[in-house]
Amino acid sequence: MFQNNPLLAQLKQQIEANKEYVEGTVKASDKAFGFLECDKKSYFIPPMEMKKVMHGDKVKAVVKREDDKEQVEIDSLLEPMLDRFIAQVRFNKDNKLQLIVDHPSIKNIIPANTHKKVTETLESGDWVVAQLKTHPLRDDRFLFAQVTQFICKADDNFAPWWVTLARHEQPREPVANEKSYELHDELDREDLTSLYFTTIDSPSTQDMDDALYIEPIKQGEVQTGWRLVVAIADPTAYIPENSNLEKAARQRCFTNYLPGFNIPMLPRELSDDLCSLVPNEKRPALVGYIETDLAGNITGDTRFVSAWVESKAKLAYDNVSDYLEQVENAWQPESAETKQQIDWLHQFTLARIEWRRNNALLFKESGDYSFELNEDGSVRDIHVEYRRIANQMIEESMIIANICCAKFLADNAKTGVFNTHAGFDPKNLELAQKFLLDTLANDENRDALTALYAPEKLATLEGYCEMRRSIDEFPEKFLELRLRRYLTFAEFKSEVAPHLGLGISHYATWTSPIRKYGDMVNHRLIKQVLLGKQAKTVEEGILVRLQEARRQNRLVERDIADWLYARYLFPMVEQAVEFDCEIADVSRGGVRAKVIANGAQIFVPFSTLHDKKEEMEFRPEEIALYIKGEKAYQIGQAVKVKLTEVRLETRSIVGNII
């Protein structure tokens, strides 16, 4: 009787038209209920509705109102949180396989089966990769997954490495060695083995891709400048352009430097032996001749040649720094030639540092944290290492070499893998100006600073450098840290463009071809120019892959570090250890503080900072928390934090500000 009833159809249409739909992302809570986070509002999801979804699902829902209360009823799935995911194995009381998702906010236990290609016998706690197969909203079935890859056993101490690499789909093994390697030289190689090249690296470094020789330029008896000869390892001489090795390097893009070990971009036989500029061994190299005046200005064009070189000494950063800083009982150069090279390179470096201070931008000094591991992968200690003078000597030599490479490629090849940075994101230029003026301007200097920080000026290389130099002496860290949030990302481009972060008009790296694929590409382009060939424009796909691989490697390094920090600090909870920290972030949930001594990040919930929520105000534009209208905590602020909890399963570290 109701079939094909036009009145009923009309009624259904009216009911549907009166429904209020919203779209958003599911946010789980510690309880059975959750919230739907929409653009401008958050809606309550009751427990029964939460059974249809999981944290992170993007869904469409209907708003339901009763009295003054609002909640949503889930309508449909827009995008599931999970597709491919990492999990730990467990078995229920009936010995059925289940998966615990490795995500701090996902509490769902997912039934699963195993793909036939997984041959390992799974045990409780094992780490696996899985694929979500069914979802209640999409398939009218409960959540169900399939294990597609075994990662490691539950008790594997190296789980942080293997799990993280699997999460980001990164290889854990080096590229396999070839049976043999042949040189494929099109250019004649000059014999430069008589030049006294040296390398400066960490003692443990095997993949040495740069060696330096320096001498003064003289007119008669008067020194007028410096001639720096930069020899760079030449892996492209062993790797044909469309070979499997080239394709593997293009996919990896970078050597992955992880706590405890690295995963090289090239086979170790190449990276650590045939191409590495080891002492007292003849090696093929691409060599650049760079000349400067005594003030560090580049004079004339850089000359590139294909050559044979032989490093005469492998020097260590700390030894060279101790010698130059005249540390008591310091290491001394083992020959007069080595001493001369160190002293000349030191003088050249001081000139280049001063040149960059006046004409570009210098890096703000901040320590690098390194994990010292036991053989079983446990953390013995964490060290903070600062750049000393020997590090700066290599750094300045590589920077000038990369500036010269960029100019050579721009002038001759008209293409390359150029490192670029546009400075502030265009949409943030006015915000950056406002922040600078709010922080620095007073009645006397407001007009001058308004002109200095004009958005159109901040968008230029010259204007950006002027701004950076003007804030160099500002005593508080929050200014520098806040400005970073307005910056855009560095990019690889095939056409020359400024790198505002360095304060340089053109920059292209070629000094690390053993560990960076973009440098290999630039080597090939330099060789094409030297051969008189038409250089091929760098493919967009290469630039995209470089960008993605750089992002992935940073995430891998961060995730492993988070895990190791949690392991390292876990035994200290009982001792209620206190740390000197610096606030690294302020968000709606709390404060994140970085431990100065070891780099760990400790989360401090807002609830521990003040007992009256209504008296607290988070101001995102300042990255600050106000209490009772007064600024209480801000990014860059020094605080003391007591460690209160470490959750190993989520790698979260919690503390209280004291």
From Swiss-Prot:
Its main location: cytoplasm. It comes from the Bacteria. GO terms for biological process: mRNA catabolic process. It holds the Pfam family OB_RNB. InterPro entries: CSD, NA-bd_OB-fold, RNase_B_OB_dom, RNase_II, RNase_II/R, RNase_II/RNase_R, RNR_Ribonuclease, S1_domain. Signal peptide: none annotated. It catalyses: Exonucleolytic cleavage in the 3'- to 5'-direction to yield nucleoside 5'-phosphates. The keyword RNA-binding applies. This is Exoribonuclease 2. The gene is rnb.
